[in-house]
């Protein structure tokens, strides 16, 4: 059976998350349903990142095995046809070897978190960005965020329901920048804990609005205590933007 790697974009708002769940719509279920209509038999789709309810993706990666040997353009276009009207799109499809696994072969995952600091309600970006009603100091947030680089016990920024065996992770890159009224955080790591990015963002916003200093933020990280985390940022502003794999880009 040929194996295909697909790159996927989706609006996370209508979904309970990536992972298939009983009695709740998921991105995985939408893709598997569409792939089954193409292949004529049940198809399992494996994703690189199990995004939470409401979290978006610009370039989620998944793989699937089909009984039919189809061109990559046919796979992309046919799955997109059967996905309608769900807000999910296959941007690209490629043939890969049988040992490729979207989740376990990944070497790095990249996330973006979008914030807008304004008093007025959102209209065009509603559900796609976090509106913070106080002015954010993006430079202070960036400075504080550098404490997260490298290997740490991220218990403070780990959801209480996280099932990972260890809270220790290595963060490869993190940056906070302002673009007009929008503040964007980007970060990269091999893997993340459950709600780690949203927890880090929520605590950095405490720095951005002047409630915490960079030292307060570092102390919260070092405490390795979930109760020291600031408010968890909403899912609205979070996007999985890319997944890296070994070999040529």
UniProtKB/Swiss-Prot annotation:
The active site is at 52 (nucleophile). SUPFAM superfamilies: Pseudouridine synthase (SSF55120). It is an enzyme of class 5 (isomerase). Its EC number is 5.4.99.12. GO terms for biological process: tRNA pseudouridine synthesis. NCBIfam families: hisT_truA. PANTHER family: PSEUDOURIDYLATE SYNTHASE (PTHR11142), TRNA PSEUDOURIDINE SYNTHASE-LIKE 1 (PTHR11142:SF0). This is tRNA pseudouridine synthase A.
